[in-house]
Amino acid sequence: MELHSLKAAEGSRKVRNRVGRGTSSGNGKTSGRGQKGQKSRSGGGVRPGFEGGQTELFRRMPKRGFLNVNRKEYAIVNLETLNRLEDGATVSAETLVAAKIVKDVKSGVKVLANGELTAKNLTVKVAKVSAAAKAAIEAAGGSVEEA
């Protein structure tokens, strides 16, 4: 076997169907779009969700909730993620961004108790810490300061 004799497996490469290239191709003249009508035109077709004039499903459903303009969105960090830091490290929004654990700080960082904490003596200075996470950090010899 040599490079010039390599061939693709039979049936692995399908020839693209070129429409509008003669009637004997099976997709000539109208290019598989039928005769006249909205869908035969260039740029034609209906928008997603359109139901032919019947009120769309999303309009039949009742409205729910609202978006609070004063909402606070926290960057979430779990205990298992804090294991990437050395023992005795200080955990703050700046150190987490520098360690590439958090990309965008948003309204601050919140530490949650997902996973097991193996890093010891961490000093955590973030916006929010869940009660379970606080207990786990203090059990591992660390301290928590909520800003």
From Swiss-Prot:
Record PROSITE patterns: RIBOSOMAL_L15
Compositionally biased intervals (Basic and acidic residues): 1-13
Record's function text: Binds to the 23S rRNA.
InterPro entries, sorted: Ribosomal_uL15, Ribosomal_uL15/eL18, Ribosomal_uL15/eL18_sf, Ribosomal_uL15_bac-type, Ribosomal_uL15_CS
Pfam family, one: Ribosomal_L27A
Oligomer and partners: Part of the 50S ribosomal subunit.
Gene Ontology MF, one: structural constituent of ribosome
Keywords, alphabetical: Ribonucleoprotein, Ribosomal protein, RNA-binding, rRNA-binding
Biased composition (Gly residues): 23-35, 42-52
HAMAP family reported for this sequence: Ribosomal_uL15
Gene3D superfamilies: 3.100.10.10
PANTHER family assigned to the protein according to its UniProt record, in alphabetical order: 50S RIBOSOMAL PROTEIN L15, LARGE RIBOSOMAL SUBUNIT PROTEIN UL15M
GO cellular component: cytosolic large ribosomal subunit
One GO term (biological process): translation
Membership in a protein family: Belongs to the universal ribosomal protein uL15 family.
Residue segments, region Disordered: 1-57
Official protein name in the record: Large ribosomal subunit protein uL15
Annotated source species: Lactococcus lactis subsp. cremoris (strain MG1363)
